[in-house]
């Protein structure tokens, strides 16, 4: 599992992504070439990059080097900037649901 930043890594851990697997945090996509020596031995690279131009460029750079070993995991948090944004949105939605449940506004539906 490969992340652009440490907050995305921490968010992945909270969400249960990659339990029992190795993780590598770039801290900036500009550090990608420094990470190659750590990535070369892996059979699959699950990339959790930001949904922006820099994230897409980094993904394409990895695909050029590693081909089919590279998996784009950004679909998990589509509509959000990154994993941390997705986690914050998910937590806010759960909190709103719980508050509505207390007020009886969820029509008896439970999470």
At which residue positions do the language-model features occur?
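Conserved Lys-Pro-Asp/Glu-containing loop-to-beta segment of HAD-superfamily phosphomonoesterases
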Residues: 1-4, 47
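Helix N-cap/beta->alpha junction signal
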Residues: 4-7, 51
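TOPRIM fold recognition
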Residues: 14-111
């Amino acid at each position: 599992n490969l992340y652009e930043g440490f907050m995305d890594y921490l968010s992945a851990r909270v969400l249960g992504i990659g339990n029992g697997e190795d993780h590598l945090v770039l801290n900036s996509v500009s550090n990608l070439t420094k990470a190659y020596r750590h990535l070369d031995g892996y059979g699959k690279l699950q990339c959790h990059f930001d949904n922006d131009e820099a994230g897409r460029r980094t993904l394409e750079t990895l695909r050029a080097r590693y081909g089919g070993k590279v998996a784009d995991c950004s679909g998990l948090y589509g509509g959000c900037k990154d994993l941390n944004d997705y986690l914050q949105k998910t937590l806010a939605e759960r909190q709103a649901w719980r508050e509505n449940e207390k007020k009886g506004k969820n029509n008896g539906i439970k999470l």
